[in-house]
Amino acid sequence: MRKLTIPFNVFIDTEFTDFLDPQLVSIGLVVQSGEEFYAELPYELRECSEFVKAAVLPLLGYAPHAEMTKDDLYLQMNNWLRLVRPKDQEVFVCYDYQTDWDLFYDVLDGRVPPWCKRRLVADRINELLRYEFHKKNNLPEHHALNDARANCYAFRELPSSSTAVPGG
């Protein structure tokens, strides 16, 4: 009998300067069991789009100890991933937008631990549940940690064909 393993998902979200040349502004990581990581990086205001200036930047600066350099972020995020990872288990880094993965990869300088697997989950995020999460918890969107939390809450695993019951 094969042991059923539940995927260990880490949901990530990022906020960045603009779509043309995205530079990381903040990153949030959330595990379904409740562990969280959040960081904010220095940014150049002139590189930020008008949308980012209006919707993202006003939400920054409220989390104690979140501001750090990119080097510190590399160390702290790597340590956090190692701490939350179940023993000898793969970690699925779940993202709903390609730039989130690209910026995560960039923070790790391309040295993503071999036990971290990327997983695009945009088609598994229930948008109504995501909206409900923000409203119910009175948390604004376009904040990396809030959005990672919302994605974790709204994520629904699609049934796998190997576990489907015929005629059921």
For each of these PLM feature ranges, what is it?
Residues V30-V31, D109-P113, S160:
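Short, surface-exposed basic-aromatic patches at helix termini and helix-loop junctions that form
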